[in-house]
Amino acid sequence: MLGFLLLTFLTVYAFVAALLATTRLRYGSRAETLLTACLLWNFIILLPIHALGVAGVLYRSTLGWSSFLISSAVIGASFARVDSWEGFLREGWQTAHDVARLPFEALTISFQRRSLVFVGLVAVLSVLSWTAWMAYLAPSDAWDGIWYHETMIGYAIQNHGYATMHLPMNLTQQANGYPRNCEMTGLWFVIFTDRRLVELPNSLMAVATADSHCSGLVTSRCT
């Protein structure tokens, strides 16, 4: 339970940092704001993972503290040279509020206008919510997950970094040279807890991307 609480705190804290940094960019579109915040959040959690992984000191404790410090640094940088800290906090809160309302407004407006976009939104959000729930309930049995995705995650945790894995000289060597951003995002969700959330990032990022793109089709008022 403590592991899940720590994961929740660090994940939310990193997203708050990303959202505050995105607020400084002042996008006119809420969809763009959401996508940018998700990308920055991903960067914030991947930066310490890659740095610690290359150094061979990727432990739960080092990652937790590194992530906290990086998120704090991003939050601090977001407040740099603002006219009023209180005013910027209100602006950040408004940004979070607007982004949170985006999917609900998209559904409401598309329904009121009897738009086919409503059907698409409901279908996409339902499928992605279902797959996120199933990712938690059932282990992955897809060929690529067992082949190299989860292999890379497991060995990175076991070896406390990106040490070369001693695998047969066949296609399993992909686990030694494949790009790691997706896998290390998955590592973020399991290193503090267990493997139940290893496939969750796929659904989370897909929800943000699909919601932003579909919502942008409804009306400029939603974005």
Place the predicted regions along the sequence by residue.
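Membrane-embedded, hydrophobic transmembrane alpha-helices
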Residues: 1-108
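Residue-level signal for transmembrane alpha-helical positions in Major Facilitator Superfamily
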Residues: 13, 43, 177, 205-212
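Loop-to-helix entry region of an early transmembrane alpha helix in multi-pass inner-membrane enzymes
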Residues: 3-4, 66, 176, 180-184, ...
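Transmembrane alpha-helix boundary and packing residues in multipass membrane permease domains
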Residues: 19, 49, 151, 183, ...
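Transmembrane-helix motifs of polytopic, lipid-linked glycan transferases
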Residues: 17-18, 72-80, 197-221
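Extracytoplasmic catalytic/substrate-binding loops of multi-pass membrane glycan-assembly enzymes
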Residues: 138-152, 158-185, 193-197
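Loop-to-transmembrane boundary segments
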Residues: 103-123
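Transmembrane signal-anchor helices characteristic of membrane glycosylation enzymes that use polyprenol
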Residues: 73-79, 116-142
